Amino acid sequence: MTDEVAALDQDQDSDYDGAWKEALRRFLREFLAKYFPLVYAAIDWTHEPEWCDKELSQVIGQAGKRNRQVDVLVKVRLLSGQEQWILVHLEIQSSYEEAFASRISLYNAGIYWICQRRVLTLAVLADLRRGWAPDEDLFQVGPFEYRLKFPVCKLIDHLDTDWRDDYSLPALLARAQIDALRTAGDALGRYRAKRNLVLGLYDLGYTEQQVREIFLLVDWMMHLRIDLEKQLTREIVEFEEARKMPYITSVERFAEARGEARGEARGRTSVLLSQLA
């Protein structure tokens, strides 16, 4: 068992998948602009994207869903006019998978078969395994060749280089994901990472609503032990009172969510994010 898999096994309460799905639904434009700028620039954003959950569930049901994997399928219109509409399949992969590229190829073909539309597949690698960034599925025998090449965004590489001082929402959520993985099994390390990320939000120029939205996503993703959750709650309350900035503590669920079942808190988080829109 690799260190990464062992860490994941120790951290089953953190809901990376749920946080990512909620974030992508609410901030698709921002995430595409940061993670895949060339794709973002090719889309006609005057037309509202359409989510294709039913079609995606058919493909995943046939191919089989893996752990630590988030898939979204959305129909968008291109600026080029080559095709009025295409399907963008975006997958976020939080752990190493040996047959990742071939499964991506299978999904791409399955979506095309079900929807009869061209599919643009994008992959966000949100794992800790350096040097692992598959971006092509290739099968060749004699004169026959099948090749699928897809864009990849490796979060840990960007965070260590060009995103080091980037505090946009997509970069912050990437940082929360990587910090959560790095501190799996390290309760105090997770607490410090989450505390630094949350308290740092107030000095980044975000509005009150934006701070709440980011906090709710980070809170969803970076689960803490109950005693450390309570300690962080106290620190946030004191911090906001000192600054007279009741951004997070004015969210109705803030105090009560800490003492309830994590599953209920996750469901309420999704509702609260919708209310903040």
Tell me what each language-model feature is.
Residues 1-226:
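Conserved single-residue anchors adjacent to enzymatic active/cofactor-binding motifs
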